[in-house]
Design a protein with these regions (language model features):
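Short, glycine/proline-biased beta-turn/loop segments that scaffold the active-site neighborhood
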Residues: 162-178, 260-262
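Secretory targeting and sorting signals
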Residues: 1-28
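A short, well-structured edge-of-sheet supersecondary motif
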Residues: 64, 76-131, 163, 202-204, ...
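Short, surface-exposed loop or secondary-structure junction motifs
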Residues: 34-50, 108, 113-115, 119-120, ...
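Beta-sandwich/jellyroll recognition modules and their flexible linkers
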Residues: 70, 348-355, 372, 378-383, ...
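Short, conserved phosphate/pyrophosphate- and ester-handling motifs at nucleotide-, phospho-/glycolipid
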Residues: 65, 145, 320
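Acidic/histidine-rich, surface-exposed loop or edge segments in extracytoplasmic proteins
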Residues: 49-61
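Active-site SXXK
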Residues: 70, 74-80, 96, 102-110, ...
Length: 590
């Protein structure tokens, strides 16, 4: 195992050791006794207690505001109804499960697992339609990559696989066409330079042997390690390595190493026909350039996985939200659930540590995607992990708040061409993030609100300065899209012309030095100080929060505003809260 890989996990593990030191023989966690429960501004370090076991509860029992969760579920359910603009829903049906600190705070199903009679959206007779249920089984699509990666990490942990070794050292044929230098790590972080998909697709090859040769003889698109390119071929190649070193097929490795010990009884490749009524239907494949499969229902949707017999490193796993909740909590617990450990804390940490720092925006651990706001929404952070699946599945695990959001839809039923479901992916995570509290040190704060392409301002009353430099001090909580959604302190002597004020911030994750804008997602309160040049006459201050057209964080909170000069206090924002003028800003206690 790479010493470099071990080193990058050390900070995570130090925190994990502190957290887990007292958890031997622990009973299931009681989230209502944790002072950080329900808090968005109390980031956890390390893993949850190893004894944390999921239990059903209400948002209130987890310290959450039920309003944002109810609103998110209503929106997610609403997308199962026909849109007047498109004439069809965003997806046929969906199931959402949200959990915080070991409490499943909502689990809702809406729409249909089977609804359509053809690719154009003709409806089946009502008697043949199948409603979506919370125990519906979904084709996970690329969420399957997480299972392949966990199996690989188990083999690395056991010393049978070296993350720094070349793939060709296990599969000599893989060295063909200049691939000899590609490493196992590069497969797992999508930095191998391999193309996204096999060309031609594997189902066009005549037999299994030729399909395997197609993978092994792939021509790279880029030099290994030179770029990030998400590739299904990476995970299929990893599958072949795992099968070579263990002598077992991937489905057996997943069953024996993950699903059986964790009790994930509804998780499998190639589900039996007896389960078909519980499985969400998918696409009608009958167009040009597609295998003529008709309605894909109960078989893997991905054509390359189908060509590999339904068991593939990149796709093929079927599961429910309940089973995937167990996997999510296992990750949060440091690799264990109900006393069944599937990997060590160090191994778990390596899956959650960014190894792609050379490729900003494409953060990736050994298996998990990291810090992807486009589907992680307001749960996003540098430590938030997850994956999506083409069929409509979304898996987001946030160790910072010990929360996870699962949003599964059958978006490809009846056609893959009905549009993106990324708004739904974010909505589930946003609802959970918005339900958590941001509690100001003094009890209440001014809150910016949330919205794309919006501007919110919070303005002090005019104060009279005395010709001395003016000091401004306040506390702020900033959770915004880094570098894009910015909050700025501004000053004006006439109420019309505004100038940016340089500030310094202190606290976990605060920017270094003097800056004119604040953004990011440290999930911690910062103390902010600014000094304005000596001036005489009226002076107003305002906080201006501007968002771009896509993606927002939890927003901005401001409290404890103090304006003073050498003569003494000029304005105390806590004593005179109603003196502020807020446009889209509101007073809140959470």
């Amino acid at each position: 195992m790479s010493m470099r890989t071990i080193a990058v996990t050390s900070a995570f593990l130090v925190a994990a050791v502190v957290v887990s030191a007292g958890t031997a023989g622990a009973t299931p966690a009681r989230p209502d006794h944790d002072p950080a429960t329900g808090r968005f501004d109390q980031p956890h370090q390390g893993f949850a207690p190893a004894g944390t076991v999921l239990r059903d509860g209400t948002p209130q029992q987890a310290g959450l505001d039920p309003g944002p969760i109810d609103a998110a579920v209503a929106q997610l359910n609403g997308w199962t109804r026909d849109d007047p603009t498109t004439g069809h829903p965003l997806y046929s049906g969906q199931v959402t499960l949200l959990a915080h600190d070991g409490v499943i705070v909502t689990k809702e199903a809406a729409g249909y697992a089977l609804r359509y009679a053809d690719q154009q959206g003709g409806l089946l007779p009502t008697t043949e339609q199948i409603p979506m249920r919370t125990n519906t089984i979904f084709d996970l699509a690329s969420l399957s990559k997480l299972f392949t990666s966990i199996v690989a990490m188990q083999q690395i942990q056991a010393g049978r696989l070296d993350v720094d070794a070349t793939v060709a050292s296990y599969l000599p044929q893989f060295a063909s066409n200049g691939k000899g230098a590609i490493t196992i790590e590069q497969l797992m972080t999508h930095t191998s330079g391999l193309p996204a998909d096999p060309t031609p697709p594997l189902w066009q090859d005549p037999d299994m042997a030729s399909r395997i040769d197609s993978i092994l003889d792939t021509v790279p698109q880029f030099t290994p390690g030179s770029t990030y390119l998400y590739s299904d071929i990476n995970m299929i190649a990893l599958q072949l390595v795992l099968q070579k070193i263990t002598g077992k097929t991937l489905d057996v490795l997943v069953r024996d190493g993950i699903t059986r010990p964790l009790g994930m009884h509804d998780t499998m490749y190639n589900p039996p026909a007896s389960l078909k009524p519980r499985i969400a239907a998918e696409e009608y494949e009958q167009g040009p350039g597609e295998p003529q499969r008709g309605l894909v229902w109960g078989q893997v949707h991905d054509e390359n996985a189908w060509a590999l017999g339904g068991v593939a490193g990149h796709a093929g796993v079927f599961s429910t939200v309940d089973d995937m909740a167990i996997l999510a909590q296992t990750i949060l617990n440091g690799g264990t659930y109900r006393g069944h450990r599937i990997m060590s804390e160090q191994t778990d940490a390596q899956m959650l540590t960014n190894l792609n720092q050379a490729f900003p925006g494409d953060a990736h651990g050994l298996g998990f995607e990291l810090d992807q706001r486009w589907y992680m929404g307001r749960l996003d952070s540098t430590r938030t992990a997850g994956h999506t699946g083409f069929t409509g599945t979304t898996f987001v695990v946030d160790p910072v708040s010990r929360s996870f959001a699962l949003q599964f839809s059958n978006r490809v039923h009846p056609s893959r061409n009905w549009g993106s479901t990324n708004p739904a992916r974010r909505a589930a995570a946003d609802g959970l993030a918005n339900a958590m509290a941001v509690r100001a040190p003094g009890g209440v704060s001014w809150y910016s609100g949330i919205g794309d392409a919006s501007t919110a301002t919070l303005t002090t009353p005019a104060v009279t300065t005395t010709g001395e430099p003016v000091s401004v001090d306040y506390a702020t909580f900033v959770d915004t899209e880094p570098g894009s959604d910015l909050v700025t302190l501004q000053s004006s002597t006439d109420g019309t012309t505004w100038s940016d004020v340089p500030v310094t911030a202190t606290g976990p994750g605060a920017p270094t030095g003097t800056v004119t804008t604040l953004s990011g997602g440290a999930r911690a309160w910062w103390r902010v100080h600014a000094t304005l040049p000596a001036t005489s006459g009226p002076l107003e201050l305002r906080w201006r929060y501007v968002t771009d057209s896509l993606y927002t964080g939890r927003g901005v909170n401001v409290t404890g505003v103090r304006v003073s000069d050498a003569s003494g206090p000029l304005f105390d924002g806590d004593r005179d809260q109603q003196a502020f003028t807020g446009t889209h800003w509101v007073l809140t206690d959470r």
